[in-house]
Amino acid sequence: MKHTLYIAKVGDEKRAAYAYIVTNYEGIQAAGHFITAGKHRHDGQMTDHIAFQRALRAASALAGVVDLTIVFDHSLIDLAFEMVAVERPKYPSIYQNSVRLTGRFHSYEFASTDFNETGACPEEVSVMDDAMEVLGNCRTFKGRLLLLKNCLFNNKIIIS
């Protein structure tokens, strides 16, 4: 069955937030987000690959995913260029893991779009809104406490 993975990234001076949505003709099948924290939070290429790999794992865990179209946000265009071998990867071992994870699917193709408000499909807008909401929540006191709790107990959404 054909699925589409939308992935987006937003960031500020302290951290970055990633969000993804996996859809098919029935609607949204999976969604999630990740937040950078720790010593690698400002290393965009490394955290981009880690978020991409986690989103691919979530997509491959769904039953019936055979064909996957991966739609990158404009902020992840460097990752897209690495994946189609236009640019040389900064971290070859992490790049190889990303390539290996795409091999879980019968076929896959890459696409890129600029998630803006003109001409965007609902999934593109939704994934961008999710990433912006997660980043916005990290700016509040309650959000920072939740981020600390997630760093300690729910490490699945933290990229460190």
Label for each model-derived stretch:
Residues 1-46, 58, 159:
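RNase H-like nuclease fold core
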Residues 11-16, 73-160:
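C-terminal functional segments of enzyme domains
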Residues 26, 31, 37, 63, ...:
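Feature targets compositionally biased, intrinsically disordered low-complexity regions
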Residues 41-49, 87-91:
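Flexible, glycine- and charge-enriched loops at secondary-structure boundaries
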Residues 55-65:
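Short amphipathic alpha-helices and their capping/turn segments at secondary-structure boundaries
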Residues 65-74:
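Short glycine-rich phosphate-binding loop at a beta-alpha junction
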